[in-house]
Amino acid sequence: MKTTEQNYSIKEAMLFSQRIAQLSKALWKSIEKDWQQWIKPFDLNINEHHILWIAYHFKGASISEIAKFGVMHVSTAFNFSKKLEERGLLSFSKKQDDKRNTYIELTEKGEEVLLKLMESYDPTQNAVFNGALPLRELYGKFPEILEMMCIIRNIYGDDFMEIFERAFENIKNDFVEQDGKLVKRNAKSQEKEKELTSQSS
């Protein structure tokens, strides 16, 4: 039987886990309030917005994938997805080679709502953003929270972090800032950028 040597004290372990727990609770309280305010005009709750977000980046995800990457129970993912389907924001389907799983995809209306949400984002109304602003002014960039990401990777696995990173990479590539708003880059400007990149290399 494999034994691992305990090279930490119980007090140290308790202090660390409670520090993380209480800081996370305080942070979540603020995040939840701002998130709800942001999506309120679109008549969405946090789970519904998260489902739309994941569906956008997956381009077709199973309910179990939605549950996994949305950190919610499968029944929660299914029930909220159903509500979004009733509103015409999602469509449900089965794959020919996978009849067991239910897959969801954003409808045109669903993508439209998500893009309008992106456009309506106002950083001045976000407490976490404003709380991190002094650090950006001091160091020239926002905190990368690498230690937190490492902890999350160790809890939820590599797949979770790959999807997490893919979503933010998509935003970097698919969206541009226009008149102080985030808007989806149109196909023509994407082609033009690719041409310029290939010419310069």
UniProtKB/Swiss-Prot annotation:
Keyword set, alphabetical order = DNA-binding, Repressor, Sporulation, Transcription, Transcription regulation
BP GO annotations? negative regulation of DNA-templated transcription; response to stress; sporulation resulting in formation of a cellular spore
Coiled-coil region(s):
none
Looking at the UniProt feature table, which residue ranges are given for the DNA-binding region? Answer: 63-86
Q: Which Pfam families does the annotation name?
A: MarR
Where in this chain does the record put each HTH marR-type domain? 13-157
GO MF, one example: DNA binding
Read off the Gene3D superfamilies from this record: Winged helix-like DNA-binding domain superfamily/Winged helix DNA-binding domain (1.10.10.10)
InterPro entries assigned to the protein according to its UniProt record, in alphabetical order: HTH_MarR-typ, HTH_tscrpt_reg_Hpr, MarR/SlyA-like, Tscrpt_reg_MarR-type_CS, WH-like_DNA-bd_sf, WH_DNA-bd_sf
Give the function comment from the record.
Negative regulator of protease production and sporulation.
Matching HAMAP family = HTH_type_Hpr (MF_01911)
Task: Describe the protein's quaternary organization and the partners it interacts with.
Answer: Homodimer.
Query: What is this protein identified as?
Result: HTH-type transcriptional regulator Hpr
Organism equals Geobacillus sp. (strain WCH70)
